């Protein structure tokens, strides 16, 4: 078997979306599984829609996820350049060869003329191009030229055959050539279209397998016809193998749109999804390691991935499942690695100060690693550490529930016990020993009653890292200041929020 060569060739429009990244991932995984090559090129021939910002965003998304490539943008390779906008001379040369070989022909008909011919023949005027110009005489061509018309160039399809191919995802495919009109490969100004340059680049770069989205399935017969024309003029060697990946759907099983917030890859990154979690989840959009194994590493993906195992059915993007898988990958991280990633994330996205003590942060990170689904969750759990004592606001619902009249006694007792602990001994174990002895054993309070009020008083909310560790992180002074402030607000009398 010859070396597998796959490609990822997005257009730089908009923000990277999960469907696009899933395509990149499957190409990457297939290349790595087979020991082949991944080529990364940019299809930027649409000057009105393409932007450098989007171009850079695509590169950033691949680098964030750790999806590397063997040839292409920034890496170089034997088929440079890898941006279509820089390959126009190549396309023009091949277009001239196609013209000379009679594989393409000039078409002068306007859309209105095509519709009129359909109407005159009793056909649906919206049927599309009718191949009229394919058989123009020299005189007719000369007359159109005399009118000042500039032709588009269309590829001659074989309408007397069936276009067949074996799709690695969908099986045997068969399309009647009669249903495929001759299609435009170059505009009247000579500019080549996607219909020409995409397959042409694949041919010139030796692409053996085209793994792409299901939305491009209808174009496959036309591309096969173009490949065959390129083979006849000596530009291509073979028609590649195709595999069309299933749609990614959203709510209601409709195709996930670029406008859907959950389709935006960077929304997930900014919320604190880590690359391992995102890649694991995207792999499941059409593929699985086994029926009962959803969590796996990229090494396992590379070892087991085969494009033939991808299912053709639409794959629904389930945000909750993505977060659950991400939580598993967060827990799988080495503590030091997790701590560094969390710190970088909180400083970049949540405004955490760079000078927050490293030892305290490491302690805090260890407390939340098993309690969060995305890195952003840690900010909600740990924000109380950054809040000045006098600025701490109690979450009303939690305070009403936990700071009732009955909370005064455990708050007073806790303050008394904690005051007796020396500053240098204000650590988790002595704190827990003192409070559990007084509140649980001597006062015979249930832990929920005893500690609920303390938690709300020092953290401002009912959900936090473990209570005694949180007190150690705050330190003796801040802990006591907050407990006294909580006692002053007990029973909590904040007004009910308006519905």
From Swiss-Prot:
GO BP of this protein: glutamyl-tRNA aminoacylation
Positions of ATP binding: 258
Localization in the cell: Cytoplasm
EC number: 6.1.1.17
SUPFAM superfamilies assigned to the protein according to its UniProt record, in alphabetical order: An anticodon-binding domain of class I aminoacyl-tRNA synthetases (SSF48163), Nucleotidylyl transferase (SSF52374)
One annotated Gene Ontology cellular component of this protein: cytosol
CDD domains: GluRS_core
Motif 'KMSKS' region mapped to chain: 255-259
Predominant cellular place of this UniProt entry's protein: cytoplasm
GO-annotated molecular function: ATP binding; glutamate-tRNA ligase activity; tRNA binding; zinc ion binding
Sequence motif 'HIGH' region, residues: 10-20
Top-rank lineage group of the source organism: Bacteria
Keywords for the protein's UniProt record, in alphabetical order: Aminoacyl-tRNA synthetase, ATP-binding, Cytoplasm, Ligase, Nucleotide-binding, Protein biosynthesis
Record InterPro entries: aa-tRNA-synth_I_cd-bd (IPR045462), aa-tRNA-synth_I_codon-bd_sub2 (IPR020751), aa_tRNA-synth_I_cd-bd_sf (IPR008925), Glu-tRNA-ligase_bac/mito (IPR004527), Glu-tRNA-synth_I_codon-bd_sub1 (IPR020752), Glu/Gln-tRNA-synth (IPR000924), Glu/Gln-tRNA-synth_Ib_cat-dom (IPR020058), GluQ/Sye (IPR049940)
The reaction(s) this protein catalyses: tRNA(Glu) + L-glutamate + ATP = L-glutamyl-tRNA(Glu) + AMP + diphosphate
Bridged cysteine pairs (disulfide): none
Keyword flag Metal-binding: no
Role played: Catalyzes the attachment of glutamate to tRNA(Glu) in a two-step reaction: glutamate is first activated by ATP to form Glu-AMP and then transferred to the acceptor end of tRNA(Glu).
Subunit structure: Monomer.
NCBIfam families: gltX_bact
Similarity annotation: Belongs to the class-I aminoacyl-tRNA synthetase family. Glutamate--tRNA ligase type 1 subfamily.
Name of the protein in question: Glutamate--tRNA ligase
Species in which this protein is naturally found: Corynebacterium urealyticum (strain ATCC 43042 / DSM 7109)
